[in-house]
Amino acid sequence: MPLIKSINNSTPKILEGVFLADNAVVVGDVIIGKESSVWFNTVIRGDVNSIIIGNSVNIQDGVIVHCTYQKTKTIIGDNVSIGHNAIIHGCEIRNNVLIGMGAIIMDNVIIEENSIIAAGAVLTKGTYVKSGSLFAGVPAKFKRSLFEEEIENSIIKTAENYKKYLSWYN
């Protein structure tokens, strides 16, 4: 059974249709939107600030989502896919974004919609990703604009697939 823990008078709010894996941890000031999925060994820790997760978000195995005390919340839009073992910290990820496996997203990063962050990329503090961009590398840099079919076949398709996987578990 997942660990859902209140802290500092804040209790996580889990909306309808959400899947939480048996060993997922959700703590504190967290909202998880409808039809989202939080997979195995994931920690979402809203103990020092707020974490707001939109609808149809998939947070894959081993991901850590956190924020910074008195400084940065973490806000994740709708239809976002966060790949296995990524670290999401004190940033804003807008709608229809794919975060690759093992990527690290640091404080005050803003990722606009319809963007892809490559596996293993490190977005350092304050990086701004404009809509429709591919960022990769350490530190991550703009590589190119995405093609419409990449948005459809990578970002949208991954989010749709995880909604299907969610149905197998709920």
Describe the role of every protein-language-model region.
Residues 1-37, 43, 168-170:
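Extended, small-residue-rich solenoid/repeat segments and analogous flexible loops
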Residues 81:
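Short proline/glycine- and basic residue-enriched helix-capping loop/turn segments at helix->loop/beta transitions
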Residues 1-13, 47, 53-55, 61-62, ...:
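Glycine-rich hexapeptide-repeat left-handed beta-helix
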